[in-house]
UniProtKB/Swiss-Prot annotation:
Covalent S-S links between cysteines: none
Keywords: 4Fe-4S, Iron, Iron-sulfur, Isoprene biosynthesis, Metal-binding, Oxidoreductase
GO biological process, one term: dimethylallyl diphosphate biosynthetic process
Gene name, Swiss-Prot/TrEMBL: ispH
Similarity comment: family membership: Belongs to the IspH family.
Residue numbers annotated as active site: 126 (proton donor)
One Pfam family recorded for the sequence: LYTB
Organism: Acidithiobacillus ferrooxidans (strain ATCC 23270 / DSM 14882 / CIP 104768 / NCIMB 8455)
Protein known as: 4-hydroxy-3-methylbut-2-enyl diphosphate reductase
């Protein structure tokens, strides 16, 4: 069996930044450090940080007074920021800068008196954070083309759309076409809201999937971008499995298989890919082959407040 590795795969700049923020906070302030929601959607990453003293909570009411709290990469509603400020909590924001970009678009449209349509998945923390940037009733959530048909904005001539950053590019394009067809004056962002890492990983799977007999996507089931990769592989007609780690591999999947493709969602560490390859090689697979792909050079700086805290400590 041959193993073909999608490129790029795994951690994106926003995930790297979020994990570094928790790491640095633990180093500077010691445990416990509170994190609102899983900092990224990967059980292995969360368990590692938890073992080092991070405490993951869903609401700020679970955070004691005078504690340090970190907001996850997915972003938070304005009300959460206000709650933290009112309590005087020490906050470091791990919101991905590309999610923050969407929030800034929301604020601009809101200042212009426009209602908004958010293309996204109900219940996802990024969607909750984005919808929480405006008053209730100012933003409508749609997940697919069918949802567009039932939209009833108060003023169809003053409407804008934004998107969750981790969606299927193809599905989102179809929804945007439906929105523009029904609301010809609808405005949208100058640059696509779907993040570069999501686009690159989907493009890599599109290139890889037709050439393999089975595709493994490494990622958590609650990871939006990982789930979209698995859906894409299936849509392209390739037997596809979304797995969290090597323990979820099943030997019978590979009976009669000649080529195995492997990709990984933006919140999946490369160590998990390596463990999966080790297991497959134990079952007779050959040395993995890296496929050509886009080289990602994007990096995001840490929050200024965290950098300043480290500078003060080093100067003490």
């Amino acid at each position: 069996m041959d193993i073909l590795l999608a490129n790029p795969r795994g951690f994106c700049a926003g995930v790297n930044r979020a994990i570094q923020i928790v790491d640095r906070a633990l180093e500077l302030f010691g445990a416990p450090i509170y994190v609102r929601h899983e900092v990224v959607h990967n059980r292995h990453v969360v368990e590692d940080l938890r073992a080092r003293g991070a405490i993951f909570v869903e609401e700020l009411d679970e955070v004691p007074d005078a504690a340090t709290v970190i907001f996850s990469a997915h972003g938070v509603p304005i009300a959460v920021r206000e709650h933290a400020a009112a309590r005087g909590l020490s906050v470091f924001d791990a919101t991905c800068p590309l999610v923050t970009k969407v929030h800034m678009e929301v604020k601009k449209y809101s200042r212009d008196g426009m209602e908004m349509v958010l293309i996204g998945h109900a219940g996802h923390p990024e969607v909750e954070g984005t919808m929480g940037q405006v008053e209730e009733g100012m933003m409508y959530l749609v997940s697919n083309v069918s949802d567009v048909a039932t939209l009833a904005p108060r003023n169809p001539d003053k409407l804008a759309y934004i998107t969750q950053t981790t969606l299927s590019m193809d599905d989102t394009a179809e929804v945007i076409v439906a929105l523009r067809s029904r609301f010809p004056l609808i405005e949208g962002p100058k640059k696509d809201d779907i993040c570069y890492a999501t686009q690159n990983r989907q493009d890599a799977v599109k290139s890889l999937a037709p050439d393999v007999d089975i595709l493994l996507v490494v990622g958590a089931p609650n990871s939006s971008n990982s789930s979209r990769l698995a859906e894409l592989g299936t849509r392209l007609g390739t037997q596809t499995h979304l797995i969290e780690d090597a323990q979820q591999l099943r030997r019978e999947w590979f009976e009669g298989v000649g080529k195995i493709g492997i990709s990984a969602g933006a919140s999946a560490p490369e160590s998990l890919v390596q463990e999966i390859m080790d297991t497959l090689r134990g079952w007779g697979a050959r040395v993995p082959q890296e496929m050509p792909g886009v080289e990602e050079k994007v990096t995001f700086s840490l929050p200024l407040a965290l950098i300043q805290a480290q500078t003060r400590r080093e100067g003490a």
